[in-house]
Amino acid sequence: MISDQDLEHLRLAVSLAHEALKAGDAPFGSVLVSSDNKVLQTDRNRTVTGANGDGRADATLHPEFTLARWAQLNLSDEERAKSTVYTSGEHCAMCSAAHAWCGLGRIVYVSSTQQLEAWKAEFGVGAPVAPLSINQVVPELTVEGPVEELAKVVYQFHVENWTGKGFKSKS
């Protein structure tokens, strides 16, 4: 069940997604939170603008992937297993695998892979990999989402990204 604290972290992830969009990247944001509800690390999509805003495009700079990498280098096995990743969009297959290989815990997301695929179809946008859900990649992982009230905002970000036409969000 998604709690009020979960929603707070998801709102931060959505804010990071908006930051990514404003910077010129696809709108995705993620937050890594410890078992005692402390925000450990945040990131946004940087696939176009580069790790340091240097413009060196890197298709692996998804926020879920960079948080998994950060956690692997900075947290113990136990800390990683007890952590939660909050994200504006369900992990892709690459990020799901990184999450599992690094031994991270629960994932809570705003919009699902299924939703993203429907939105992409609406605008004729493709993807280079199969649209797998997290649990298709990591069957035993605890995953919660989508969160419809926030997914509407994320949808608007994607529309703006794909069309260049912004919609005014009330959230």
Give the positions of each predicted feature.
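Glycine/small-residue-rich phosphate/adenosyl-binding loop
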Residues: 41, 64-74
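Zinc-dependent deaminase
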Residues: 1-20, 91, 100-171
